[in-house]
Regions:
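Phosphate-handling DNA/RNA-contact segment within nucleic-acid enzymes
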Residues: 3-70, 74, 87-88
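Intrinsically disordered, low-complexity segments enriched in Ser/Pro/Gly/Ala and basic residues
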Residues: 1-2, 76, 133-134
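Acidic-enriched, low-complexity/disordered segments with a strong bias for Aspartate over Glutamate
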Residues: 4, 9-12, 39, 79-81, ...
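C-terminal or mid-to-C-terminal helical accessory/interaction module adjacent to the motor/catalytic core
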Residues: 101-168
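Short glycine-/small-residue-rich flexible loop motifs, especially phosphate/cofactor-binding loops
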Residues: 40, 92, 163
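Conserved catalytic cores of soluble enzyme domains
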Residues: 25, 57-109, 116-125, 129
Length: 168
């Protein structure tokens, strides 16, 4: 079985989530959405059976609809690199459109859940999950990083962007 499998009439990658068969019967109130299936395997081995991932494809509205059937709360646990952060920013509006409450897990200084668990352990990850930031605060944090807060004009541009985020 490969994540490179194409979608067909019988199988649609944009409407399936790896690990959902376990996550939907988890006793947790939220589902943790990971970037890839290897992250899900690591999470499950560490006891986080509420972790899922898109199957080798970008996160879609079909995935959002599927998650909505099983939870009201999603925690995004994507890689802490730039690509992972961009993927989080793309996933947030899809999940919000479904009416889901979205929080973002901070894995720094580690790249992904597997490295985090190996470095600090499952208990430390549980604590990070408990303290996961709201999607709005994550978006504001990312936006703030794009502006020079010491420059008045740049700071004003950031404030306008933050106001737009608040209005959505």
């Amino acid at each position: 079985w490969s994540s490179d499998v194409c979608s067909s009439d019988l199988f649609d990658k944009s409407r399936n989530l790896y690990g959902l068969n376990f996550a939907r019967s988890s006793r947790k109130k939220e589902i943790i959405l990971c970037e890839g299936y290897m992250d899900v395997i690591s999470m499950h081995q560490a006891g986080f059976t509420n972790a899922v991932a898109a199957l080798g494809t970008a996160f879609t509205s079909g995935h959002g609809t599927l998650l909505k059937r099983y939870t009201e709360n999603v925690i995004l646990s994507f890689d802490s690199d730039e690509a992972g952060q961009r993927a989080i920013l793309r996933a947030i509006p899809i999940l919000k459109e479904e009416g889901l409450t979205v929080r973002v897990l901070d894995l720094t200084p580690y790249k992904d859940p597997d490295e985090f668990i190996k470095g600090l352990g499952a208990q430390a990850l549980e604590e990070r999950i408990r303290k996961a930031m709201s999607s709005f605060m994550f978006q504001v944090k990312v936006a703030a990083g794009r502006y020079d807060q010491d420059d008045p004009e740049s700071k004003t541009q950031f404030q306008h962007e933050a106001a737009k985020l608040l209005a959505t």
